[in-house]
Each structure stands twice: as structure tokens, then as C-alpha cells.
Amino acid sequence: MHVLFIIDPLPLLKAYKDSSVAMMQALQARGHTLSVALQGDLYIDAGEVRTRFAPIALRDGADLHGHDWWRETGAADEAPLARFDAVVMRKDPPFDMEYVYSTHLLEYAQQQGARVFNSGAAIRNHPEKLAITEFPDLTTPTLVTRDMGRIRAFHAAQGDVIVKPLDGMGGTGIFRLQRSEPNLNAILETLTDNGTRTIMAQRYIPEIVKGDKRILLIGGEPVPYSLARIPLAGETRGNLAAGGRGVAQPLSERDLHLARTVADRLAGRGLLLVGLDVIGDYITEVNVTSPTCFVEITEQTGFNVPEMFAVALESAAG
């Protein structure tokens, strides 16, 4: 297959721990050809969704801590997305309007015969924090609103809540509001921009001290290990970007129940790769843009997550 990755600039990637790089390694090892494009390389001309792209190969045995781990194998070119055997969307958030426009282009490309993973429409229709509201039985009590009075009432009823923006990533903008929080109003005014920006409030889950878990679903099947992201002492955010420590562990029975309950439904919508964030017994986020943790799970357990992805992509692309 000729696989196109829509991705951030390669020199900016931390290749030694980047899941997209791990995917590329697995695909190249299985004999597939790789190309890369940036989000800004996508365009429509005369109704056809096209892209500028660069064909690349990963260097065998390269030091992934440096910048010399890949090479261009030909001149940059342009082509319709439908010409590739598979298009893998791996552009990191933020999920801003440019990202939304990109999902539209990917959706149009699919209508023209392109095989895109994850599907453009599916990415757009599953905002990572809002998507959990489809599964209320699997989540902690959750409120989505910009009404500060409603949030205060929710806080009073629950006693201990987490509030966060809907478009944040890496743990940014997340606050824990305990019952006696003296800065409640100031925090809500800031997060909601004085009632003009919708946010999410969730009942605090004490098990966060043991870490939140990233459970990966690939082709409708759960990876048998999660990555528990243990917060720093005094932190309520387990995100690796916020200083959390990643520890791989086998899925529990509850983890498997959560994963299997949502896996088929999400896979059937064109979501080849999904990352569930789980705290205790509850799903807290459904990540569909650029799920990670491939490398950490593989290195700590020996289970080859990138290989599982490559096999699933081959099957899905037909």
C-alpha cells in the first residue's frame, strides 16, 4: 500500500515516543510505502480534493532522539487523496476551525473514493470531551453548559467537581473545585469567559490518584494493556504533558466492559483508532483525533501496538 500520513512537521516530532512514527515503522516493515503531508497541504481544485506530499522512508537503525531518522525518497508531488491506498489523519489538536475545515476536505475526499482513517466526518462528529455524553451509563455525572448558575448548582449537588474547557488538550485549563473552593466564581468566569463559552463539569473521581488510563481501541478491538498516567503529587491531572508518569498494565474486567461496550459502535462510524480515557470505573474522554501511547505500552509489555494498527489498517483499506 501507499499510505499518506497527514501529520505535524516531522522535525517537530519526538520520534522516540511518537505513536505516528511507530505506525510508520510498522507499516514500512510490512512493505508499505510512506508519504507525508501537512494539514495546510490539503486543497480542493475543480471539486477534487488533492494534496501536496513528500514520499519518505524511515532510516533503519536511526537514533529516534535526533532529527535524522527519516529521509525523502523522491521529489515533492501533488495528487488526489483518492490515489493513495490509505490516508491516515494524525494531525494533533487543537481542534480549531482549521481542523474542522480539514475534516470536511477529508469527508469530501472519501466521497471521491479516498480511504481515510479516522474518517473526517467521524472525527468532526466526536468532539473528544462531548463524545462521552453518548454513554451516560459509563460516565461520572457530567454537565455541559456555559450557564454559571447551572454549574454552581451542579457543584453544590456534587460537592467536588472537575471543570474543563471543551477544546483543551494535555490537561490545560482543568480545575478541581472542592466544596469550599474560595475562587469558584473567578474560575467559572474565566473558563466560561463570563458565560459565553461552553465548558464541562464532572463529579470528581477519587481514583485519579491512581492515574487515569488510556485504553486503545484498534479496528473495534481493545489493546489488552492500558497506560495508566499517574499524576505528580498534589496534581489532579494525569496527562503525560502535565508531568504524569506512564505505567502500562493489563486491562481489568471493568476496563474490558467499557471498551467492548463502545468499540463496535465507534468502529462502525469510521473510527479505526480510538483512545478512551478512563478514571476508576468511568470513561472521561473519547479521543479520536490523534490517540497516543503506542510506544509506552509496547516498550513496557512487549505487546506490539503499532503492528496491531498496521494489520487493522491493511484490513480496513482493503
UniProtKB/Swiss-Prot annotation:
The keyword Magnesium applies. Residues 129-314 form the ATP-grasp domain. Keywords: ATP-binding, Glutathione biosynthesis, Ligase, Magnesium, Manganese, Metal-binding, Nucleotide-binding. ATP binds at residues 155-211. GO terms for molecular function: ATP binding; glutathione synthase activity; metal ion binding. Its EC number is 6.3.2.3. It is an enzyme of class 6 (ligase). PROSITE patterns: ATP_GRASP (PS50975). Gene3D superfamilies: 3.40.50.20, ATP-grasp fold, A domain, ATP-grasp fold, B domain. Its cofactor is Mg(2+); Mn(2+). Pathway: Sulfur metabolism; glutathione biosynthesis; glutathione from L-cysteine and L-glutamate: step 2/2. Binds 1 Mg(2+) or Mn(2+) ion per subunit. One of its GO terms (cellular component) is cytoplasm. The keyword Metal-binding applies. Mg(2+) binds at residues 285, 287. It catalyses: gamma-L-glutamyl-L-cysteine + glycine + ATP = glutathione + ADP + phosphate + H(+). PANTHER family: GLUTATHIONE SYNTHETASE, RIBOSOMAL PROTEIN S6 MODIFICATION PROTEIN. Belongs to the prokaryotic GSH synthase family. This is Glutathione synthetase.
